[in-house]
């Protein structure tokens, strides 16, 4: 047996996005601005839904959890990324890396299933309006929220355990801005085909299962909309689903490019850009999509502003 002098990795070094000093300044303030908008937009959405009784419906119950998931997924990556931009040593501990990968994967997988639950909610609201309150009971809504977290927990726990049980005995430099699974697998001192196969199967299963629920729901919704006689009725039904369709298209498109495509199909630079999109941009965009295209949210916000002006003016 060949004797190898190997060093066990106890921490990782993140290369980040750039070493150019001016680019660092621009990126820091840009990502800080985006992160603050993400926190403000999603916390604002959660608060508005919480305090306005007219928004205490299943649709906004799911939207509140979607905003929570967006805050958590962004917060698992962005603060550490901001700290590392100007850091001399962009290190992260072995356990810290595992925790970051676990939390981010958990909330991203949960978001996929939450979007599927929201699609089912829209299906019931448009296709079975008379049975809506009966079908979408409080118990069913809780199950449709707990289920995504449970399935995401199982999937992410599997990936994290499989990844961090691998031996890391060579380079500890991760050519990325956070602990993502593909850059980590490239550092392992063992064959990772099992990990990649499990990742492909589980990520594919999450995408296919949630995607099928969304697709079937919207096929039924489309068929129902086409049967509506009035143009106003069709327009109202369409705009009810527009925000959700936009959020689904953005998230699933980026996650498909990252996790389901073959690893050699794009360069590392494009991989980082796509990763930035779903770690930084999507959590910021979601509350904007759901508020700007949603009359009920805009009306609720307007009512709170007018009430505040009335109280101040008294």
Swiss-Prot record:
It is a multi-pass membrane protein. Glycans are attached at residue 5. Residues 46-97, 165-167, 218-237, 290-314 are cytoplasmic. Coiled coil: none annotated. InterPro entries: GPCR_Rhodpsn, GPCR_Rhodpsn_7TM, Olfact_rcpt. GO terms for cellular component: plasma membrane. Keywords: Cell membrane, Disulfide bond, G-protein coupled receptor, Glycoprotein, Membrane, Receptor, Transducer, Transmembrane, Transmembrane helix. Residues 1-24, 119-143, 189-196, 259-268 are extracellular. Disulfide bonds join 97-179. It is found in: Cell membrane. This is Olfactory receptor 5G3.
């Amino acid at each position: 047996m060949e004797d190898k002098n190997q060093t066990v990795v106890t921490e990782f070094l993140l290369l980040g996005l750039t070493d150019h000093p001016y680019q660092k300044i621009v990126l820091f303030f840009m990502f800080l601005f985006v992160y603050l908008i993400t926190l403000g937009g999603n916390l604002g959405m959660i608060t508005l839904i919480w305090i306005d009784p007219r928004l205490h419906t299943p649709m906004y119950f799911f939207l509140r959890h979607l905003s929570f998931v967006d805050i958590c997924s962004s917060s698992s990556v962005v603060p550490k990324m901001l700290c590392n931009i100007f850091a001399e040593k962009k290190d992260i501990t072995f356990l810290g890396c595992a925790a970051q990968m676990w939390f981010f994967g958990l909330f991203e997988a949960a978001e996929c299933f939450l979007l599927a639950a929201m699609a089912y909610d829209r299906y019931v609201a448009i296709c079975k309006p008379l049975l809506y309150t009966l079908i979408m009971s409080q118990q069913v809504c809780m199950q449709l929220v707990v289920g995504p977290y449970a399935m995401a927990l199982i999937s992410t726990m599997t990936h994290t355990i499989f990844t961090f049980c691998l031996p890391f005995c060579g380079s500890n430099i991760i050519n990325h801005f956070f602990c993502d699974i593909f850059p980590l697998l490239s550092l392992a001192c063992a064959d990772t085909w099992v990990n990649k196969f499990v990742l492909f199967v589980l990520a594919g299963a999450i995408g296919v299962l949630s995607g099928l629920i969304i697709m079937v729901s919207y096929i039924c919704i489309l068929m129902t909309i086409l049967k509506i006689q009035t143009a106003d009725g069709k327009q109202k039904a369409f705009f009810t689903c527009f925000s959700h369709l936009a959020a689904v298209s953005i998230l699933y498109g980026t996650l498909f490019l990252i996790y389901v495509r073959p690893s050699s199909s794009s360069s590392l630079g494009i991989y980082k850009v796509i990763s930035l999109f779903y770690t930084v941009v999507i959590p910021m965009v979601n509350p904007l999509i759901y508020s700007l295209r949603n009359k009920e949210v805009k009306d609720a916000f307007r009512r709170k502003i007018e009430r505040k002006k009335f109280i101040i003016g008294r």
